[in-house]
Regions:
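Extended, charge-rich alpha-helical interface modules
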Residues: 188-239, 243
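Residues forming the flavin
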Residues: 1-189, 193-199, 242-452
Length: 452
């Protein structure tokens, strides 16, 4: 990405949206709306001081909601450019509340709350659509209990947990454990605050809160308003300390997830949703299981699927190595349902077609390999650009020309065309770039003549 950002022949228009495409191959006029960041790209140094001081935490979409960011943020650390952006849906300044902390903090004077959208018009020879994809929402399959059982996560969420730059620093902390730790942290802050208030009263009356409260409950100080308030504060403190101590006992037994289950074809190869194979999921699950084993050698993984489609060069060897070196077990069969056992452990009920039996097994975490779905907004984009979609809402192409769309001069690559893995996406992107270069360097463009 850094090479792209520094390339003299590449202009990046990030945080932008294509509003109109007019013309024909070799002579397109593209209208782009550059959305207001409320941060000047030329002035912002990407130091992050504004985000550090911002008082508004927001669920972090890049980490799939498993962590938090601030209302002023950079999408991720390696993003190009490193300019920050203000999220107006959460920023206190845009919600009618007084704040402006980021503006006061920024030494480069880059924050500008008055910034507006800009319209940019481009003259281009060709257009390449590389809109990517979205993942299938597994909550549409109720038997998998996604978002009901905390330790059932998607493959993308698990990817962020494995990442050293993710919300857990690469440690496989279970979501249920992290939720309890967050709750415990909140209670500890409340307890510390109430303890501070009680300490002042103890110094004032020269008596411990516990000793005073025992006397108070026995009828002493009945009409003393100051001591009544002391008793109320002590009761509030006890109401915090009791659940806090219970959570501390639970947290003592926390450990990283070591028993993992990967469920394949969640939403794909399923006529209720997407009948096609998503292509990359099998190898992605194997890769995640291997990395999890590298993080914690005691980890065991079970991959449930109708079959494992290892179709690329070296893929079958990679699959076998995962089984022999990374404690991966491959189970041929479909998962019927997931229930919640003790300690928030998911219990998977499945059919093993080789053993010809239905059985259940408990795991620390379940990872759902979700289908590759057409990206949100692809229908509107297709209308704007003027290309056709197939029956699944991927960009329609010809089998003999897999990067050419229905409109000459407009090309497509990657998962905007169909589900595919990274090597295939790169190969198709190279093909689309070559086709676009033909138009860019062609002096005379032949136009089709109308035939009566």
């Amino acid at each position: 990405m850094l090479d792209v950002g520094r390339h003299p022949n590449i202009e990046l228009l990030v945080y932008s949206e294509v509003e109109k495409v007019e013309g024909e191959a070799g002579e397109f006029k593209v209208t782009v709306r550059r959305r207001a960041r409320y941060v000047d790209e030329d002035k912002c140094t990407g130091c992050g001081a504004c985000a550090e001081k911002c008082p508004t935490p927001v669920p972090d979409a890049f980490n799939e909601g498993l962590g938090s960011r601030k209302a002023i943020y950079s999408l991720f650390a390696q993003g190009i450019p490193s300019t920050h952006t203000i999220d107006t849906d959460y920023c206190r300044q845009f919600q009618g509340k007084k704040c402006g902390v980021c503006q006061k903090t920024c030494q480069a004077d880059a924050v500008n709350f008055e910034q507006e959208d800009r319209i940019v018009e481009l003259q281009v020879a060709a257009v390449i659509i590389a809109a990517g994809y979205d993942v299938f929402d597994p909550s549409l399959i109720p038997e998998y209990r996604y978002q009901e059982i905390p330790n059932v996560v998607t493959a993308i969420e698990f990817e962020r947990l494995l990442s050293a730059s993710g919300p857990t620093g690469g440690h496989l902390d279970r979501p249920s454990d992290r939720a309890i730790e967050a709750q415990l942290e909140g209670l500890e802050k409340k307890a510390k605050k109430s303890q501070k208030a009680l300490k002042k009263l103890e110094e004032k009356f020269d008596e411990t809160s516990a000793a005073f409260y025992k006397k108070f409950k026995n009828g002493a100080y009945g009409e003393d308003e100051d001591r009544q308030k002391w008793a109320e504060k002590y009761e509030d403190h006890l109401a915090v300390v009791k659940p806090m101590n219970e959570l501390k006992k639970q947290a003592e037994g926390f450990d990283v997830a070591k028993r993992l289950a990967f469920i394949q074809c969640v939403g794909s190869r399923d006529f209720r949703f997407y009948p096609f194979c998503s292509g990359y999921c099998c190898m992605h699950s194997i890769k995640e299981a291997i990395i999890a084993h590298e993080h914690e050698p005691e980890t065991t993984s079970t991959i449930f699927g109708m079959d494992i489609r290892a179709v690329g060069k070296g893929f079958e060897e990679y699959k076998i190595r995962g089984g022999s070196h990374s404690n991966i077990t491959y189970v041929r069969g479909r998962v019927a349902e997931i229930t919640e056992g003790s300690n928030h452990n998911p219990v998977v009920t499945y059919e093993d077609t080789r053993a010809r039996e239905v059985t259940s097994q408990e795991f620390d975490m379940v990872i759902l390999a979700t289908a590759c779905a057409p990206t949100k907004g692809i229908v509107e984009l297709a209308k704007t650009v003027g290309v056709e979609l197939d029956s699944y809402n991927f960009i329609k192409t010809s089998p003999l020309s897999p990067v050419d769309t229905s409109t000459p001069g407009i090309f497509v690559c990657g998962c905007a065309e169909s589900p595919m893995d990274v090597p295939e996406s790169v190969a198709q992107a190279s093909s689309a770039a070559e086709r676009a270069a033909e138009l860019a360097f062609q002096s005379d463009i032949e136009k089709e003549k109308a035939v009566a």
